[in-house]
Amino acid sequence: MIAVIGAGVIGSAVACALALEGRRVLLIDRDAPGEAGASFGNAGHIATELLEPLPSPGMLFGFWRLLTAFEGPLHIPVRRVPAFLPWATRFASAAFRREANTVHLAPFVRPAADALDSMLRDIGRPDLLQRRGHYELWLNRGAHRRAAAQARAMEKLEVPTAPAPADLLDTARRAARANEIAGLWYPKCAHVVDPLEVVRAFAATAAQHGASVVRRNVRSLVTRGESIEVVSGTDTIVVSHAVICTGAWSAELLRPFGLAIPLEAARGYHVEMPGAIPLIDAPILYQDQNTFVTPMTGRLRSTSFMDFGGLDSPADPRHPAQLRRTLIALGYPADALQGSWVGPRPVLPDYLPAIGRVADTPNVLYAFGHQHIGLTLSAMTARTVADLVAARAPAPSVAAFDLRRFS
């Protein structure tokens, strides 16, 4: 039996892929599938344009500028600065390896929408994915110059874009009372209409194909010969393989295997506007406001902010309040929100995911650290883990995602 630990979008997709191949699977999480962590509250954007890792020489200046901006989108509590500095040092180092890291990340991201589309069709839920692209808008002075620069950057990466339609731009400009506007359309991107339903669909399909879905708070993994003991607060389950997919909580489970993992919890926030009519039927990224708005079933969801407050800090109420003010300024009906959410994204300093095997314990595998694009990469990751379990060579190669890169 294979224990998949963590029932977020990565773990549930992995369990689904393994079960569809006829393997005995145990999907374990302390919460119901998709109801905790970043999988519940993400923007729903299938971000196949994000071929480059975030760290870059130019981003180093932008990172600190955003950090010090009044009500800016990036926040690190003062008390966490000492603990955060080692991660930040590695982030800065990775900035000068961006080109090499793009070579590893881009082949994994580029086919991600097709892979997710195929997987959702295989489980009978193609309705969850909408392939209408997404829009990127600039509303401040210099909007046309910045849109043109972004189009050139995307062309170098072979990411297709087109100018946003004039009627859409006029609608967004009037809603925000802006004097200038420019925008791009990314036709190859997509979005899901309900991220939680995607996770539930993966978990339900796994269960329909024989997987057991159980609620346990896994505390540790112990090797016993060729078996793995999954130790929870209530019992111990013996399995042949374990796959760690616990997102921002993964480092602690892997520590006993000699892996010191520089994993941070970059918390994101969302608010929802129930019953709101979208400006268009596809997601919009407002670049100047660092705000994403996605049409979902029965509501609009808006996401923003990156808060390195750690796993245990309470949510910062200033962030949803600021997001609400931003949405009102952009012309959205954000006076009566459906509530706010905060969840931790698992982020490694080079912004590459961690996918592979524990070197000295090959029946312990891991798949986490997908930063902002876990939903995007869920199907690709599931396929890759299924290949690793079956001793098939994954395509594309994920050798660069091995955790030994941090040794």
Model-derived features with residue positions:
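Flavin (FAD/FMN) cofactor-binding core of flavoprotein oxidoreductases
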Residues: L137, R141-G142, P165-R173, A265-A266, ...
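A conserved short coil-to-beta-strand element within the FAD-binding core of flavoproteins
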Residues: A166-R173, H191, V214-I228
